[in-house]
């Protein structure tokens, strides 16, 4: 075991080109900048982040302060400026840290705007604070000179990218997806597309797209790492992401982030190899390529090495545990929502719901209803009405809104009917439980009812 550790440490300390990290940094910064500009240009900062009077929060994240609206707008400007600095490699660690803090703060304000690519940007932003992303093609490298990077840095970013595809692929191995759902509900809406539109409404199209998507996610990382299949695999990847964006524009910048970020799975010096093949720079053979690594890297202090290794292992373990944590909960996590977010469950769910809250005054047992539509924005209400934890939070807010003149805590129960992937609507929550008295629990919520139908057979 000690010998294996030593060999792994030696391989991770080996100097490699920092060009693939530079491409990833430039792409990440560009997409981060474009995302911030898009949020501001479309008015989403006001409507989704600064505008709502009440926010629905991620579990255990209620301690994150909700700043005034003007501060939220300022944070998005900071995100844009920090992303631009990351893109050009200007004090990249400070810029990445600023981006990560501002972006994560904004992301944690509102659970109903959760997107997988926001979570991916949070993780990559944190990684870029510590990885040597500006060793090449950056303002920093112009000031201090270009340098190579440890191979471990490249592999850590590779893991970051690979985990998205691998866990997204594993998540697709369920009965609904392999039977063409929810794609079978979405694709007919694109029947207006030329040439292929008439085919999209068929069950065969939904099955082919579902099985093809699962196969792609489960295998593309291996094919990108293998030189013999790399070019074909990347062409397939580009085609897959562009096609997905054309069919479902709501996925936003995710394809434009993953297409360039996936190139980190190529050889670390792939940009130079491409330029050499195009005749845009003289060939430099690997055995004669001069080393530009900072002096003394080979004599890294043992204590520092152990700290770095432990931190990397914990970081990787966290990102393996989060997508798999739903296994610790009973029932179907797509229905209960427990362990769903931060797990790369990409395009797996079509939920529609309706919820009405029954409020009871314990003093005289008088009861009335409130659908909470005046408390939350349409976007918040739509997501909340299908999510048990957010319904619980809404019940607490409904109690506050209706209990201003009451001397006793009001009881709030929910009639929540939800449809999952085309199933008949069914009760999501026990209608007899007073949600206003229910705290958040780390474990399973006992008042969430099981999915009424058995999962569709594989």
Predicted regions and their residues:
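Alpha-helical membrane-anchoring segments
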Residues: 1-458
């Amino acid at each position: 075991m000690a010998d294996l550790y030593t060999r792994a440490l030696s391989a991770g300390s080996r100097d490699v080109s920092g060009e693939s990290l530079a491409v990833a940094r430039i792409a990440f910064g560009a997409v981060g900048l474009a995302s911030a500009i898009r949020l501001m240009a479309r008015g989403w900062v006001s409507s989704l982040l600064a505008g709502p009077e009440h926010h629905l929060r991620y579990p255990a994240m209620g301690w994150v302060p909700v700043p005034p609206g003007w501060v939220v707008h300022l944070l998005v400007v900071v995100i844009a400026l920090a992303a631009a600095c990351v893109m050009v490699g200007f004090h990249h660690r400070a810029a990445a840290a600023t981006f990560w803090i501002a972006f994560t703060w904004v992301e944690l304000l509102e659970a109903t705007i959760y997107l997988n690519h926001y979570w991916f940007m949070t993780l990559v932003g944190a990684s870029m604070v510590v990885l040597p992303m500006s060793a090449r093609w950056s303002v920093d490298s112009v000031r201090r000179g270009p340098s190579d990077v440890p191979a471990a840095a490249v592999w850590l970013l590779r893991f970051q990218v690979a985990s998205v595809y691998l866990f997204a692929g594993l998540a697709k191995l369920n009965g609904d997806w392999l039977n063409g759902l929810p794609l079978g509900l979405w694709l007919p809406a694109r029947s207006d597309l030329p040439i292929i539109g008439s085919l999209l409404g068929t069950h065969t199209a939904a099955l082919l797209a579902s099985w093809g998507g699962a196969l792609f996610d489960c295998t593309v990382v291996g094919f990108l790492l293998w030189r013999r299949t790399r070019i074909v695999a990347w062409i397939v990847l580009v085609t897959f992401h562009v096609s997905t964006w054309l069919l479902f524009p709501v996925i936003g910048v995710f394809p434009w982030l993953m297409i360039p970020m996936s190139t980190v799975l190529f050889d670390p010096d792939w940009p130079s190899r491409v330029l050499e093949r195009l005749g845009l720079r003289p060939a430099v053979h690997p055995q004669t390529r001069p080393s530009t690594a900072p002096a003394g890297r080979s004599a890294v202090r043992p204590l520092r090495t152990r700290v770095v290794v432990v931190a990397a292992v914990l970081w990787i373990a966290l990102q393996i545990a989060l997508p798999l944590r739903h296994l610790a909960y009973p029932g179907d996590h797509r229905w209960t929502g427990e362990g769903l977010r931060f797990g790369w469950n990409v395009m797996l769910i079509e939920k529609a719901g309706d919820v009405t809250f029954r409020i009871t005054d314990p003093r005289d047992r008088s009861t009335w209803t409130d659908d909470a539509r005046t408390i939350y924005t349409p976007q918040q209400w739509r997501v909340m009405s299908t999510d048990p934890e957010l319904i619980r939070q809404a019940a607490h807010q409904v109690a506050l809104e209706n209990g201003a003149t009451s001397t006793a805590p009001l009881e709030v129960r929910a009639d929540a009917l939800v449809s999952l992937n085309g199933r008949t609507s069914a009760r999501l929550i026990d209608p007899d439980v007073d949600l206003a008295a229910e705290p958040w629990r780390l474990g399973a919520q006992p008042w969430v009812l099981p999915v009424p139908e058995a999962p569709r057979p594989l």
